[in-house]
Amino acid sequence: MSGLVCYCRQGFEPELAAELSARAAFVGIAGYARTQRNDGYVLFVCDEAAQLAAKLQWRELIFARQKLVVIAELKGIDPKDRITPILAALDGHQRFGDLWVEHPDSDAGKPLAGLARSFGNALRPALRKAGLLTDKPQLRQPRLHVCFLDGDHAVLAVADNADSAPWPLGIPRLKLLPEAPSRSALKLDEALLTLLTPEERDALVKPGMRAADLGAAPGGWTWVLTRQHVHVTSVDNGPLREHVLETGLVEHLRADGFHWKPAQPLDWMVCDMVEQPRRVAERMATWVREGWCRNTIFNLKLPMKKRWDETRLCLDLFEQQAEKSLIVRAKQLYHDREEITVLAMRE
């Protein structure tokens, strides 16, 4: 088959399928999505897979943790010899710079983790012997992915290192530090890692910058910013953890974060308030339109139904009401739940 395989959060396959279908149609490439709920991945079948992959940048896809171009789908693999059919499917292919053997992050896929680990150790030397894999990882070469969907069913796919998630399964392995005020700190950590390039992070998140955290309590997102030596005004009627205040970088204002506005423009505004997504999108747009912040990261809590439609509506609403020339990226992060995280920055 020809097409793309994209990983996603279990249960969000319909949203990813709808997104891929809409984006493919927008760039004029015909295709269809193949998936089932709770699979943890979507296969988008199309004849122009390489062209579609080039037009759908990984950072621009909202519900895709990873984006890969399919080489082959192998079914009915003999468990006693999985290597031979894989080598046959790759015959004549260019050399790869790395190998990742994976499985979907789903209830059905997680039991395949042991197989993925052990099979990777067996496949790697076989690929090198066949001249299909470099001796050491080479970022300039495409990366081979073998994704086991079952013990006898695998998808072979290729990733461009410059346009794919740099983590197996598309999941950054972040550790929740003991001093983190809440697990939500991982969301902002992941957002900064995923939505910004390394060059953008260096340029846009600098010591001495000023930020506001709306709905800050107990201080997870504020704490992440202080670790970057950013001065934070934390706005919430609720309390912050004492050690967050002790950094000397935090001013806690007991106020309604949804209505507060700064006295002077800030470098950043971040917001993880539990509110209706359209209301949040409109308020975030006001912050950008009025020049109260240069850049923002905020979360949109999605409804149980029609989540792709609501996502498009909220992002369109935000961009229309912001009335600024912006770079907008959105992702359903690994540490997100029924929500997406949005980055908006000045061009």
UniProtKB/Swiss-Prot annotation:
Keywords: Cytoplasm, Methyltransferase, rRNA processing, S-adenosyl-L-methionine, Transferase. GO terms for molecular function: S-adenosylmethionine-dependent methyltransferase activity. S-adenosyl-L-methionine binds at S184, A217, P218, G219, G220, D236, D256, D272. One of its GO terms (biological process) is methylation. It is an enzyme of class 2 (transferase). GO terms for cellular component: cytoplasm. Its EC number is 2.1.1.186. It comes from the Bacteria. It catalyses: cytidine(2498) in 23S rRNA + S-adenosyl-L-methionine = 2'-O-methylcytidine(2498) in 23S rRNA + S-adenosyl-L-homocysteine + H(+). Disulfide bonds: none annotated. It is found in: Cytoplasm. The active site is at K301. Monomer. Belongs to the class I-like SAM-binding methyltransferase superfamily. RNA methyltransferase RlmE family. RlmM subfamily. PANTHER family: RIBOSOMAL RNA LARGE SUBUNIT METHYLTRANSFERASE M, RIBOSOMAL RNA METHYLTRANSFERASE FTSJ DOMAIN-CONTAINING PROTEIN. Catalyzes the 2'-O-methylation at nucleotide C2498 in 23S rRNA. This is Ribosomal RNA large subunit methyltransferase M. It comes from Xanthomonas euvesicatoria pv. vesicatoria (strain 85-10) (Xanthomonas campestris pv. vesicatoria). The lineage of its organism: Bacteria, Pseudomonadati, Pseudomonadota, Gammaproteobacteria, Lysobacterales. The gene is rlmM.
